[in-house]
Structures are given as C-alpha cells and as structure tokens.
Amino acid sequence: MTTESLTLSEPGDDSPARYEALTRIRLEDPDAVLRAARARRPHPGPVCGRQNFIIAADHPARGALAVKDDVHAMADRRSLLDRLRIALANPMVDGVLASPDVLDDLLLIGALEGKLLFGSMNRGGLPGLVNEIDDRFTGHTAEALAEIGADGGKMLTRIAFDSEHTTAALEATARAVDSLHERRMIAMVEPFLSTARGERVTNVLTTEAVIQSVAIAQGLGARSARTWMKLPVVEEMERVMAATTLPTVLLGGDPSSSTDEALESWRSALRLPGVQGLTVGRTLLYPDDGDVASAVETAASLLTHTTQETR
C-alpha cells in the first residue's frame, strides 16, 4: 500500500478500523512518510499583517491527555485525527504544531497540503517528574524537521528560580534555537516563569511573570533573527507585547474556562501590534459543544486574514 492508494473514511465514522491503513503503511512502507513530506505543497510563508492560525496537537506526547474533567480526552488517537482533519480542512487554518507521531500520520493522510509545519522538540518534562523543569529534547530535531520541509520547531521553556534544573533547560533551548537558525527555520519558544514547589510544576500567569519570561527567552541562542514567542493571554497583554519585537503567537493554554470565554480573551489580544496569530489545540479540538468545525471557524474569524486589513 502507498499513500497514493490510501483511502480513509470521513471524520465521524466510528469504525475502529478507519485508520488501519496508516498502521499498514508504517509497517510495510515507512519511507512513505518522507515521500509524502517531500511531495506536499508548502505554505507560501508568514507575512506581516496576515495573522497565522496554527492547530496544536503535541499534548499527548507529554502525557497530557486531559481536557477539563475528561482525563482521557486525547487518549483516542483515531478521535484526535478525526478532529485534526476537520480543523485542517478549514482554509483559514494555516498549519499544525505536532509531535513526530501525529505529524507523520497527518503527512500520510495528506492533510497538510499548503500548511505550515511546526514540530514539537522537547516533550521529556513529564508532569510530576522530580526533574520536570529539565525538559529534555525527546521529539523533533532541527535536522529531522529540515528533512521533512517543516517551517520550524517549538520548545517549551519553563524558568523556575527554585529549581536547579533551570540552567540546563535554558541552555538546551538556546542550542535548539541555534540549530534551527542554522537551517533557516523558525524557533518558536514558549516561555513560562514557573515554580517547582510541591508535587508538580506550576506556571505563574501574572502579567509581570510573563513579561520576565519574555525578557529571558528572547535572548536565548546566538541569533534571534528567526525566533518567535508563543505566549499565554494574560491581563494587560499590551504590556506583555511591549516587551518584545519578536513575532508572537498566542497559545490557548489549559482549557479550564468555557470555549466562548477563551475566544473572547483572544479577541482583544489579537489586535495588539506584534501578534502574528494563534497556536491553539485542546480548546478548539475539544470544544464544549463538540462542534470542532464551528469552534475553528469562530476562532478563524478573529484573525486578520489579508495584508490589506488594518487593526
């Protein structure tokens, strides 16, 4: 079987065998992933004035499967792929941020034509580990991302002044920024000021903490020319955006609020200078009413889609 002969049912089919063809290709023809990557049509590239909409799907690789009260929401890979296919079918969605396993599935399916591709690079800081802050780069490498024609790599960078592992985490991010820059790819850095007290790492989501995390993260690496920030939406986002000249995408975060509340919080932040778009996953893939297409459509309507539009 080849990707050319791959036929899949439409999302919504509940057959447990609906993605069996992916397993067969991975077994019999693993090189099909690279062929699919090289054959696909790339995205024309980000431009100033046109905000980008990227769907994030790298949470399972960190063992983060919960969405609100459903602790195993993202555990079903078939359901996740269904939801991603629905989201990526919207022409206003520019691309995806995913771990290698998910990205390879989407390449085989052919769901990434004309899309931006960002790989998730560090997934080793599993929740609850004693050295969670030392978030090892266990996912995509810059070399592997270049091989599949990706646009960049993303790294979570948690800065905990109460953890001895913070220096190693900062150094690892800096080396990844350098490696991506050498290959002319975007380094999407997602910084948080965090605390390692207690059983789990907690991100500090005050305006001042986010500003400090930006100040530290944007200076990582020998070159910043291709570095982007990926930041949470907090109060006084205008102060946060005043802290950087780097292109910035807003993250969805832990979907603890309602889908409507999340959308409203993004609306005003997207109007700020320097905000290049949204990189959101669980809030839109697992909306309150279950309607992925509608949630994605509503989020897309918040973005500036042409370079002629003004804010």
Which residues does each PLM region occupy?
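N-proximal accessory regions
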Residues: 3-4, 8-17, 22, 41-45, ...
